[in-house]
Amino acid sequence: MNRLVNIQLSKVKSSVENLIEGSKNISALVEVAQKAQYDLYLVGGFLRDAFLGKSCKDVDFVSSKASELAKLVAIQTGSKPVLIDRKFGTVRLIPPVHPNAIGEPYVVDLSPLRGSSIFDDLYQRDFTINSLAFDISAWWIDRGAHLLDPLGGITDLEDGRLRVCSRGSLSDDPLRILRAYRLVSAYGLILPAQTRKHILQACHRLNQVAVERIRDEMMLILSSASSASILRMLDEDGVLKLLLPECVDMRNLQQSDSLHLEVWQHSLSALEALEFFLTNIRELLGDYADEASTILSQKLAGERSRQTSLKLAVLLHDIGKPFRRSVGKNGAIHFYGHEVVGSELAASLCIRLRLSNKETNFVSQLVRQHMRPIHLFRLTPTPTRALSRFFRLGPEFFWPLLLLFASDYKAFQEATSVGGDLKPLHQRIRDWLDFYYEQLKPREMEPPIVSGHDLIKFLHLSPSPMVGRLLNALAELQWEGCIRTRREALDQAARLLKQWN
């Protein structure tokens, strides 16, 4: 082993020691294993990342006495072992919560050995770069760097390639196919021909994987800063169509003579554009960038954020186009109403993937509303009432819609002879946001001009849903700045009542 690798192994050893010292949960696990003379191995991703000089918060241990160890640690520390994988018997050690205490910095999982030894276990893992183990029991005795690497994972990390541990690695668990592309992107690896061959041979088995596991891996991919490049690789190798069959009709669907990209490639380009804007969000939104980032970071389900669902919406925003394509008398191609059909298709896809109701509604609404900023952009100057109605959607929708619009615009510009001039886009979005913050947002604090009692008395109504309908209409007019006084509000209510009756 060369000097560079020895230096890296020294760093790995230091990382392991810092890990043990920096976590009460882990130090207790190590001490309990030592006292009971149980074997204990640190495995997988933490070691891979430590070798590369990266941090990792997910820590995995294995032991032939995993169940006994978990119980002993729980007794000593008050941690709660929670079963998270029934198939492999993996438990997560949840530390007790103490007031004013600093939280556990790591997520700690403990699993039984697969097979009769640590080497059997490592051979059953997915990829060689993950088939690493650090012998904690041996380290306790001499504090040495007891790294086990039976499949050459360190060499593969050095060479930047992703190899499977065995011929059956992917067929045993086809979800590892998606993980392969995610690892390639995250660590800048290459897929050797043999690995790609294994992927193509096993990808038909993806339909045997539980939908929830597919969903989790897909959302992990979308949460990556380079999700577009991962999806392109999956697409080129024919894997993505197995995961998102609803998108097959978007392929090879030409949009117009001026737009060279067909619908599916345009959607992937829009996702790339979104990732560009997320990386350069201040350039697009200026002083408003922090507010947008706060909204996008909100969690919709578990650890899945609004931003991750926005990426899915960008990928699906034109999913309705194959069903609304028409050709005018002059030969122009139209997709009238594709956002309505697309919203329904996007909702069905989200339901199939078992996304939460919040995620499903969010993605569906973004697809349904994605043409609104486009229509506003085409009007010069932008009508204030139309702009007010757009912002009436609320920050949880208008921020993602602005980013979806910007991404759609950038992808369109780059696919035409117009080029990639984004200055008009930046200026219009800044103007819209100035209008919102200077004129609309202050109105959010204004109380209603009239009450339901006022309407009942003035219009001689009895309490009914009509009163609520009138109040909602007046609130929208007040938001738009169309009514400012009590007299104006009551007169408008009378006109609306006459109109509706």
Residues of each region from the PLM?
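Catalytic cores of the polymerase beta-like nucleotidyltransferase superfamily
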Residues: 1-501
